Amino acid sequence: MIKKIIHRPKRSLFVFKKEESLLYGPRVKSAPPIEISFEPPAKIEPKLAVRFTRADGTPIRKEDLLDSTDSEILSESSVESETEVENIPQEADTGNTREESEECQREAGAEEEPRPALEDRALMLDNLLKRFSEQKIAENRGPCYSVDEILSVEDRKAISLELKIKTRKEAKGVYRPDNNRKDTCIEQARLEFNRLTAKNIGLVIKNLKAIRVGTIEEMKEIAKILFDKAISEPTFVKYYALLVLDLKKEWQSEEEKTRDITQTVFFGTLLTLTLKTLENKERWGDEYERRKEMSFEERMAYEEKLEEAETERYIKKRRTLGTIDFLSSLYSLNVISYVHMNACINTLMKLDDSENVEVLCYLIENIGEKLVVSGKEHIISMVCSSLAQKKNSYTNRIRYMIESLLDKRSSWKPREAKAGNVFSCLEVENDYGNAQNQGSQESPSEDVLPFLSSLSEELSVAYEDDDKELLSDSLQSGESKFGVIPFYLSYFQEAISNHKVSDLLSDFFISFRSTSSITEEQLREVLLSLKGDLDVLKIDFPISPKKYSELITKLRASKVISQPLFEELKTSDYNSRATDIILRWYKSDRDREKALTIFPSEAIENLIRK
């Protein structure tokens, strides 16, 4: 069949051919055509319903069954139907007539069913009449009530249930999280802790600082969440320590900002939880040796609960060792001072059981190198000698841990001393031509510098007054080790030359002046010598004249030195050097009295105008 798509008056430009014989259009040449035969579903004829009524809908009675249809005499309607069938004219096509007659015979055979006998039909009808009689229907229907009976029924009485519910008394000061709220500060902080990785730690810190924490109890709950995650996730413990390093001073709740608190609740709660975990001793060791002391019944009960005991043992051990990991990470980042680590070491050395020894070895392995570098070799020597004496009384596993710790100790080396004057080794000829080695005699201050460096590091992480009070013994140890005048001369030289620790060292001396053994005459000698060294110090440390002026100003404001000595210690450019600290004190309500002890208010007002 050809169809013309585009027609022109003269000739057709495009001609498309379409074969109607293909049922599904053209196919791939390599694939034979698939013939699909669609057969219509067989028509389901409805079954004839058995009715016990006449054609007009009236019910059949017993007398109706004894009619002429059951006799051999045919009715007129049946005779007429038979004659109509006989008088059907034959069609011309005999084949079609034959097929139709066969189909009619099949249908007639299928429709004809054997009729039951007359007695059976009468019996069936009697059974149906008995089954569906009015009495039977009334019995099956159940009890019947009249309208008056229904209206006279009283309402159902309510049964009171007295339930005794015991409610827990809420303790004061304990945070109860609201589970219905998903946008609370605690849930937001937990979400940020879960996001923490090595790559997005800066983003997590930024998001945590943006969270508004209302009360102190909420901040304590957040600190507890961070502590639990830090000790249970050893892979991320160093990242949690970095979080604490960045948030320990700045992150405060709204309630904290209204109070004058030196240490944040967030950092204080973390320290409390860490130290309490070590102080509250938890035993997790194997109870194999303890079973020898048990009776037979106790031993059988222990064997039944062995699996639960093993799980609990693992949780306790992992919690304690996780706390040591977190504590070591905080100390390595200088988040906490040596004072806290010394307290932990002393707590662990009080008892000699295997659990304590294991925790102590684990702690020294993590922080031992830093202790040696910071000049705490005597602590390592004390711990290692104590463990070496008692190692034979422990099991093989603990003994191996002690030997491993002793082997690692040999690889820990102290920090090298700072390079001194490069030209100290040069030889200088005197007037007589004899060579003199200027560096033959070492300055006593070179031995004090490592001690002062260690002290300044510990002061930088001592946030509480108790920590600084423990460090006050360093002044007495420095006096006895190096001498009073050499020690304090080096101490004040470091205070005015190192701007990073200048305020720490000067404030520390003023706070614990009473614990030192230096007299007023010795202090006067040290400060006058320090004033004479300013010309030499300012060559290498240009900031030393300004820091010297601030130092004597602080000493006079705290009444450590007298007014005559203060006037003697002043330099020619003191007024210009001390202007910054005087103005800072004068603008502060808390320190204004300090400024007025140095200058009168009129002089300070003149400085402000200038």
Swiss-Prot record:
Residues 175-414 form the MIF4G domain. Residues 59-118 are annotated as: Disordered. GO terms for cellular component: eukaryotic translation initiation factor 4F complex. GO terms for biological process: regulation of translation. GO terms for molecular function: mRNA binding; translation initiation factor activity. Residues 96-118 have a biased composition (Basic and acidic residues). Signal peptide: none annotated. Pfam families: MIF4G (PF02854). InterPro entries: ARM-type_fold, MIF4G-like_typ-3. It is found in: Cytoplasm. SUPFAM superfamilies: ARM repeat (SSF48371). Keywords: Cytoplasm, Initiation factor, Protein biosynthesis, RNA-binding, Translation regulation. Coiled coil: none annotated. Belongs to the eukaryotic initiation factor 4G family. Component of the protein complex eIF4F, which is involved in the recognition of the mRNA cap, ATP-dependent unwinding of 5'-terminal secondary structure and recruitment of mRNA to the ribosome. Component of the eIF4F complex, which composition varies with external and internal environmental conditions. This is Probable eukaryotic translation initiation factor 4 gamma homolog. It comes from Encephalitozoon cuniculi (strain GB-M1).
